[in-house]
Amino acid sequence: MTRSKPNKNTKKYLKHNKGFYGRKKNCLKLAKQYYIKSLFKKYIDKKNKKRLILKKKIALINFFSRIYFGLSYSKFVYILKINNCKLNKNIILFLLLKTIV
């Protein structure tokens, strides 16, 4: 009876850690630890990337609304809210860019 399951798991970790430096790439115990750590960092970085993109969108909306309407971002969003305009930041930015060009 061949034992393929443990070898499959070993290959999974070692295949993922191919570009790592030192024992992280070929020592199974360390490979597992750094595999889990890399997945956790990947999750955190995805969240940070979304946060950064949102900050940039808000900064652009603020920039264009100050130049063309003379309003800050918060006042611009407040006016939209008063007029029951339920648009997300992507659409607002798209519309501002379209009106400029």
Curated annotation (Swiss-Prot):
It comes from Carsonella ruddii (strain PV). Belongs to the bacterial ribosomal protein bL20 family. This is Large ribosomal subunit protein bL20. Pfam families: Ribosomal_L20. InterPro entries: Ribosomal_bL20, Ribosomal_protein_bL20_C. The gene is rplT. One of its GO terms (biological process) is translation. The keyword Chaperone does not apply. Binds directly to 23S ribosomal RNA and is necessary for the in vitro assembly process of the 50S ribosomal subunit. It is not involved in the protein synthesizing functions of that subunit. GO terms for cellular component: ribonucleoprotein complex; ribosome.
